[in-house]
Amino acid sequence: MPEQAIVIAMAVSFLITVVLSPLFIPFLRRLKFGQSIREEGPKSHQKKSGTPTMGGIMILLAIVATTLWITPKIAGLSTRTYLLLLVTVGYGVLGFLDDMIKVVMKRNLGLTSRQKFIGQLLIAAIFFAVYRQSGFSTVLHIPGADWSVDLGWAYGVLLLFMLVGGSNAVNLTDGLDGLLAGTAAIAFGAYAVLAWNQGQYDVAVFCVAVVGAVLGFLVFNAHPAKVFMGDTGSLALGGAIAAVAVLTKLELLLVIIGGVFVIETLSVIIQVASFKTTGRRVFRMSPLHHHYELVGWSEWRIVVTFWAVGLLFAMLGIYIEVWM
């Protein structure tokens, strides 16, 4: 039964990360793969320096293993499944390279912005080439409205923007213990519901595999974090959520379901634009979660608040698509 497979997929993915983490975290410590904290960041973060990073490897292993095991049992391994894994693993590898450079150089710098952008663009281009070759629709639907437009090859521009922008937006959100793991679980959970509602059980299995993986990771990433996912995890999750939005044809709904990621990104854009044009900063620090830190909020209060906002956005997205 598909319903049982969904529950099993989430449970298996959760258990993989929960079982692997106690083994993998000490291994990262022995390798001295600790997070370096940027000097211009909040002073309270300096005590986190040296916390093992690259925990996203465990998330990736759980997602890939669960998807490849459970999906054939209810829907078969489709092109959609392979596309999702292509983006997830591809962006994960890119993040891994970024993290490796950081831990080897012992400073909070990895790939250059240009190198990272080229890598993101290349993976997105491969995704679109396979997507187009496989005959998937290039029609863009307006959520909650009976209106759509066929973008043709221009859809590729939208797709590239979503994958590159999505991975960067999610990456920006990964700044506090448990913040990204929780908001990602909520966003992927919403898309799991919508994919299931469409009968795309393969996509639904992938989504719940992500939910299980990040919730299992959250056990060790909640404040005070014993491990960080690093760019290995954040870039992979960002690319994956964008790919899910594309394959479910709910591209525009990502702005709502991923509302927390959008707000975090906008806070950075507003901060930079304001400083360059007026010499003044709108926020004490960006992304937005750092602003609330400097205002005096506790880390746990910020994280739980952002989770709550993310849940509201997710429910709004489901309401728009299913009931409107």
Swiss-Prot record:
GO molecular function, one term: metal ion binding
Pathway: Cell wall biogenesis; peptidoglycan biosynthesis
Uppermost EC category: transferase
Subcellular location: Cell membrane
The EC number(s) this enzyme carries: 2.7.8.13
Family matches, as InterPro entries: Glycosyl_transferase_4 (IPR000715), PNAcMuramoyl-5peptid_Trfase (IPR003524), PNAcMuramoyl-5peptid_Trfase_CS (IPR018480)
Record's function text: Catalyzes the initial step of the lipid cycle reactions in the biosynthesis of the cell wall peptidoglycan: transfers peptidoglycan precursor phospho-MurNAc-pentapeptide from UDP-MurNAc-pentapeptide onto the lipid carrier undecaprenyl phosphate, yielding undecaprenyl-pyrophosphoryl-MurNAc-pentapeptide, known as lipid I.
Protein name as it appears in the record: Phospho-N-acetylmuramoyl-pentapeptide-transferase
Cofactor (UniProt): Mg(2+)
Protein topology in the membrane: Multi-pass membrane protein
Protein species of origin: Geobacillus kaustophilus (strain HTA426)
Key word Cell cycle present: yes
